């Protein structure tokens, strides 16, 4: 009889553990799933607007959504105000959702996720947000050493009842430690390094990609809009560059994006290559990646139903110009060698 009850108890505990385990969101599948998540972030909007100048300010919130057909998420989370320019300029600042302090949260295994939202809740800014989301998805096609993202239709609900609910698109970004882990790497904890001290081929991929999207708002030496990771099996090897934050790119073309006057261009839509010179052989090796992924890139753009036909057409026209450049040998030499950084 004792053995019967002992066995029954074990079965009950096993079943409970199985059910409990199923409540956690898988940190890998979360970003491989491409479906749109309808979610609500309940917080004190009035307070966040009053305190948004305080970078690192943390306050409580509730993140709710439905995952698949069965899991209703209602996580208590800590929300941190982050960002620099967008934190001060935009109506709602960028946030970080922190789950690691709540083991009962469905998103616990994802630890913390950056939340990227529209600058001001208007239709044009919503389209810009979707364009920045697309940039991450496109870069995923170019290299695995990239941040993965998940699109949300997000409602900001004020728990004080003093502000109207705001609904807009937003996206969640993978943590850099997860980027490193799935690439058999670790987060770089060494000193800041010069551009040419990073992995040469990966740096070439990054520089060409930034040129592709018309983005000059990045710098390796000052860790501006880039993260570094290094190979686990060789901590002394050159680190790999992982870019992020693309709202200043010509691809997105936000109203607040203005180029550095030292670049000699009038609009962020004008491309400037910010990489260092490479041999034609090195360039052809990297440009071949972009050419092989062209059809997939264009398919990714056209498959995003939340973008208008006009927005898609503008993006494709902008990328067509890039592809004309990289498939013209004289343009390749002029752009990536002659006019490269010294």
Cite the ranges covered by each PLM segment.
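Bacterial Sec-dependent N-terminal signal peptides
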Residues: 1-23
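Phosphate/dinucleotide-binding and metal-coordinating scaffold of catalytic cores
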Residues: 22-342
């Amino acid at each position: 009889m004792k053995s019967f009850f002992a066995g029954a108890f074990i079965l009950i505990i096993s079943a409970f553990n199985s059910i409990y385990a199923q409540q956690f969101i898988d940190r890998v599948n979360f970003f491989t799933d491409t479906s749109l998540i309808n979610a609500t972030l309940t917080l004190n909007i009035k307070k966040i607007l009053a305190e948004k100048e305080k970078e690192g300010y943390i306050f409580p919130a509730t993140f709710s959504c439905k995952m698949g057909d069965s899991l209703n998420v209602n996580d208590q989370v800590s929300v941190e105000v982050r960002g620099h320019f967008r934190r001060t300029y935009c109506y709602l600042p960028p946030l970080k959702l922190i789950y690691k302090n709540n083991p009962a949260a469905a998103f616990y295994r994802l630890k913390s996720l950056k939340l990227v939202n529209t600058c001001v809740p208007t239709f044009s800014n919503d389209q810009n947000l979707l364009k920045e989301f697309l940039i991450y998805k496109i870069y995923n096609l170019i290299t695995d050493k990239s941040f993965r993202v998940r699109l949300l239709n997000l409602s900001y609900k004020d728990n004080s009842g003093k502000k109207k609910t705001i609904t807009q698109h937003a996206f969640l970004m993978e943590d850099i430690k997860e980027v490193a882990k799935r690439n058999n790497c670790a987060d770089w904890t060494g000193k800041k390094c010069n551009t040419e001290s990073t992995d040469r081929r990966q740096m070439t991929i990054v520089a060409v990609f930034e040129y592709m999207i018309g983005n000059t708002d990045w710098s390796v030496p000052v860790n501006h809009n880039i993260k570094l990771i290094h190979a686990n099996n060789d901590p002394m090897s050159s680190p790999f560059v992982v870019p992020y934050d693309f709202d200043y790119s010509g691809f997105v073309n936000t109203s607040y994006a203005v180029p550095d006057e030292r670049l000699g261009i009038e609009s962020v839509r004008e491309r400037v290559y910010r990489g260092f010179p490479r041999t034609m052989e090195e360039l052809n090796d990297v440009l071949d990646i972009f050419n092989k992924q062209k059809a997939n890139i264009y398919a990714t753009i056209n498959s995003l139903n939340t973008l208008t036909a006009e927005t898609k057409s503008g993006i494709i026209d902008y990328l067509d110009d890039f592809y004309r450049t990289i498939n013209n040998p004289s343009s390749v030499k002029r752009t990536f060698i002659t006019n490269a950084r010294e």
